[in-house]
């Protein structure tokens, strides 16, 4: 789980606010609390047009200054007639900028422009067939009867003046509407979700045909602009980066090294909770193959001592996080003066902290929050850097594309998510050297068998968990009393929800047989068939 901590500074930290933005077509998504707002932005970027998510409180004047080619109003959990329902600035309709309202966004548009919205006689949730009344404009190349995803309890009962009906469903008379003259559009369904078969075509129609955008948001353009901006900002100063081996920090290291070379120093803190052979492979890869300087810090004994006797998972995270800060502080001081701290902040982190990071007078970020792969409390007060955050406009899938384009090896680009506290939270209960060794060996077998069959990219995550109990078994003619290992293999698009993977029985059999026979201290292997929700992907 990613968490954030506040970085104390003497002045407002400097960030690369405009990396990846510059002078290109922009689509703004105003967020009304929808779980899909980020997904809308991702879908637009997949069409090679840049998009950003902003609060529904953004004023029409602020939008005018941003000069977007189009505006999308997201869905949300509220009813437009609710006492505390969020409302946008009504002057938005007069900007002359195309607007697309999605679900709640459509209802809000109708409500503010003089139409009527009421509680539906029957809510509509899940898949629905969309019947097209006007196949032009927004619905060009969207097939009649195509599937769209519905999730609403209110419906439009009367369109505002100037609007026409574009489409309906069996239970929703006004499923898509438009005021063609003012370029105002509304859809009651969610075109951004994967279940909406014609959704991508609709989004492309809005972005390209209605908003008249050009495909300028490309990986190559981002890399070129990011490198130029890094060089301009950093100059001849030194930059420090905490390298974890994940795709975010590795891509950041590659990008920075291309921009400023040996002005970059990477610090890799080996806390002893990584998978088998991983620390050695990572350091060798960066130092010998990529020739990027890495300061390796072996702090295994320190971290193990910090979690000795601890069984509560949150306390384990807290102690690991605090010790990481201590080691990082000591290392940075030993290596000399650095002006900048490179931070692998991604766009979802920016969205989550947007309301707390803006100065009410200027709109500038004044209290930057630092993403950490540990559950940490805060950096030391005398550890002061300016920030370099070149990836802060990117989603995870875009980071992978950037990493691949600048030469990051596929084993890192496609690395499955791995928690910051590492194996310490895949060992339930107390972490000991014995348990770490057992879990490392079992986890290695899982990864070997998955990789050998070319199945690694089929899963969001595939790993082993060690339970702090003993089970009875029989090996040879003797009874055993040893640990059980849990296999956790899931499929997912983004980690927010997940399903247990239907791994072939013969693969599970090989994994189980190898673990029981090759890993001393294990006599039982079980398979976790719990989805998320109700369970989580990790066990702690």
Curated annotation (Swiss-Prot):
It catalyses: XMP + L-glutamine + ATP + H2O = GMP + L-glutamate + AMP + diphosphate + 2 H(+). The active site is at 103 (nucleophile), 190, 192. ATP binds at residues 244-250. Pathway: Purine metabolism; GMP biosynthesis; GMP from XMP (L-Gln route): step 1/1. One of its GO terms (cellular component) is cytosol. Keywords: ATP-binding, Glutamine amidotransferase, GMP biosynthesis, Ligase, Nucleotide-binding, Purine biosynthesis. Gene3D superfamilies: 3.30.300.10, 3.40.50.880, HUPs (3.40.50.620). The keyword Nuclease does not apply. The keyword Nucleotide-binding applies. Transmembrane segments: none annotated. GO terms for molecular function: ATP binding; GMP synthase activity. Catalyzes the synthesis of GMP from XMP. HAMAP family: GMP_synthase. This is GMP synthase [glutamine-hydrolyzing]. The gene is guaA.
């Amino acid at each position: 789980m990613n968490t954030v901590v506040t970085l104390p500074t003497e002045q407002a930290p400097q960030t690369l606010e405009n990396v990846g933005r510059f002078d290109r077509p922009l689509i703004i998504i105003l967020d009304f609390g929808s779980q899909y707002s980020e997904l809308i932005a991702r879908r637009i970027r997949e069409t090679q047009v840049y998009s950003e998510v902003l609060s529904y409180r953004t004023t029409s004047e602020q939008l005018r200054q941003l000069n977007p080619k189009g505006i999308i109003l997201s869905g949300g959990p509220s009813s437009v007639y609710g006492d505390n329902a969020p409302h946008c600035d009504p002057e938005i309709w007069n900007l002359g900028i195309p607007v697309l309202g999605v679900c709640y966004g459509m209802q809000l548009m109708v409500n503010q422009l003089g139409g009527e919205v009421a509680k539906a006689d029957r809510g509509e949730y899940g898949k629905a067939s969309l019947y097209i009344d006007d196949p032009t404009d927004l619905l060009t190349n969207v097939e009649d009867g195509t599937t769209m995803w519905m999730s609403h309890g209110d419906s439009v009962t009367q369109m505002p003046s100037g609007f026409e009906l574009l489409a309906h469903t069996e239970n929703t008379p006004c499923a898509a509407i438009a005021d063609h003259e003012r370029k105002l559009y509304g859809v009651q369904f969610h075109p951004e979700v994967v279940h909406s078969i014609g959704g991508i075509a609709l989004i492309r129609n809005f972005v390209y045909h209605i908003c008249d955008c050009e495909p300028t948001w490309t990986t190559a353009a981002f890399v070129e602009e990011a490198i130029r901006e890094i060089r301009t900002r950093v100059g001849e100063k030194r930059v420090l980066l905490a390298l974890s081996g994940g795709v975010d920090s590795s891509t950041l290291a590659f990008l920075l090294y291309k921009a400023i070379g040996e002005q970059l120093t990477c610090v890799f803190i080996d806390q002893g909770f990584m998978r088998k052979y991983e620390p050695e492979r990572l350091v060798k890869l960066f130092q010998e193959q990529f020739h990027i300087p890495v300061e390796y810090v072996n702090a295994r004994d320190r971290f193990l001592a910090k979690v000795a006797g601890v069984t509560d998972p949150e306390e384990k995270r807290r102690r690991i996080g605090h010790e990481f800060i201590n080691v990082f502080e000591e290392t940075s001081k030993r290596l000399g003066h650095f002006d900048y701290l490179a931070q692998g902040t991604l766009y979802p982190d920016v969205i989550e902290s947007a309301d707390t990071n803006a100065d009410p007078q200027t709109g500038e970020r004044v209290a930057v929050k630092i993403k950490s792969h540990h559950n940490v409390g805060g950096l030391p007060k005398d550890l002061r850097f300016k920030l370099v955050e070149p990836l802060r406009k990117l989603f995870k899938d875009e980071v992978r594309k950037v990493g691949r384009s600048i030469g990051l090896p596929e084993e890192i680009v496609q690395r499955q998510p791995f928690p910051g506290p590492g194996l310490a939270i895949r060992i339930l209960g107390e972490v000991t050297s014995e348990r770490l060794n057992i879990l490392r060996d079992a986890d290695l077998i899982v990864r070997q068998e998955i990789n050998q069959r070319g199945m690694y990219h089929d899963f969001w995550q595939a790993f082993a968990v060690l339970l702090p109990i003993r089970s009875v078994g029989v090996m040879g003619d003797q009874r055993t009393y040893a640990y059980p290992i849990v296999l956790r293999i899931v499929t997912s698009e983004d980690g927010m929800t997940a399903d247990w993977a239907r791994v072939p029985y013969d693969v599970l059999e090989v994994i189980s047989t190898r673990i029981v026979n090759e890993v001393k201290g294990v006599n039982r292997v079980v398979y976790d068939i719990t989805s998320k929700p109700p369970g989580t992907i990790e066990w702690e």
